[in-house]
Regions:
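Short, structured active-site "lid" loops
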Residues: 61-86
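A conserved helix-loop-strand patch within extracytoplasmic ligand-binding domains
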Residues: 81, 87-143, 213
Length: 295
């Protein structure tokens, strides 16, 4: 059994301006279990920054969008990796959290792992959420069957328990939020270079209405600019690929240099590139050129 864990691992800088009058933010989320869980998760990191909030539930995305644009709610929390690079008119990213663990994980139920060849994973059917993850996993483990699904995390858990899948690729953050126990689950994290994460992975973002200046001013004080610097590179490349079949991860080292890994499915084949530069200027463009270059 999974005991959901609400402890915050996404954090905003604790530098709230004491002379700023705080208000209670209204957080809008969908009624489905994973969205509600993420809403509570969001409340945790807002509280860490001195901001009180309340959750309001909605039936579907259209109702949620209408509530945001009509000022019924102030923010809608999303995982940055799940956010399209072009937002609907009237919406904007108001704040990004600090970056949590970006790694992808192979997750198997213990009853599967105990019988499997964990070196090759031969014969296992593993669920993945998109084509680039399918291609990356198949390159690492040629003897598996990687199958694309559209299940939410809690649905993916159930699919592994009932045998629909032998395992799944999940984000490390998801395994933390769901407090997945080692006695029930085998979890193998991948290095971000060998299995490139999705653009924005490990970052929570708060979407606000563009004209809600009060909320945007409040959240500006907790927005993580260092994270924005690297995720902007990732999302620029993602946009160049029309938000499809692309994974991207940018990090800055202690010397101030940027290291950018990307993977894409081009003409049905996996292509990967890693670049290092002293600046982010032109980094996404160079990665695109390298990924599309014919050998």
């Amino acid at each position: 059994m999974i005991e959901t864990q609400y402890k915050n691992t996404h954090t905003f800088p604790s530098k709230m301006m004491h002379d700023t009058q705080l208000k209670t933010l209204r957080i809008g989320v969908l009624r489905e279990p994973w969205a509600k869980l993420f809403g509570v998760y969001t409340q945790g990191f807002l509280k860490d920054s001195g901001i009180d909030s309340q959750i309001i539930l909605y039936r579907d995305n259209q109702e949620l969008a209408n509530a945001l644009l009509s000022a019924e709610i102030n923010i809608c929390p999303k995982g940055l990796k799940d956010l399209p690079t072009t937002l609907p008119e009237g919406m904007t990213i108001a704040a990004l959290s600090a970056r949590d663990d970006v790694r992808q994980c192979l997750v198997l139920p213990r009853f599967v792992a105990e019988k499997a060849d964990l070196t090759t994973l031969k014969g296992l059917k593993i669920g993945v959420c998109n084509a680039v993850n399918q291609a990356q996993l198949s390159a690492l483990y040629p003897e598996i069957k990687a199958e694309i699904h559209d299940l939410l995390p809690l649905e993916g858990i159930e699919a592994m328990r009932n045998g629909q899948f032998d395992g799944s690729i999940m984000t490390t953050v998801t395994t933390k939020v769901l407090a997945m126990r080692e006695d029930e689950w085998f979890i193998r994290p991948f290095n971000a270079r060998e299995f490139v994460p999705e653009a924005g992975q490990g970052v929570a973002c708060l979407v606000a209405a563009t004209d809600d200046l009060a909320t945007r001013r409040l959240l500006k004080t907790v927005h993580n600019r260092d994270v924005a610097m690297v995720t902007n590179v990732e999302r620029t490349l993602k946009k160049m690929f029309n938000d499809r079949d692309i994974a991207a991860h940018c990090e800055r080292d202690k010397m101030g240099n940027y290291h950018f890994s990307a993977a894409a499915v081009v003409n049905g084949a996996l292509r990967k590139v890693r670049l290092s530069r002293s600046t982010t200027i032109g980094l996404a463009e160079s990665a695109k050129t390298a990924l599309l270059k014919e050998n």
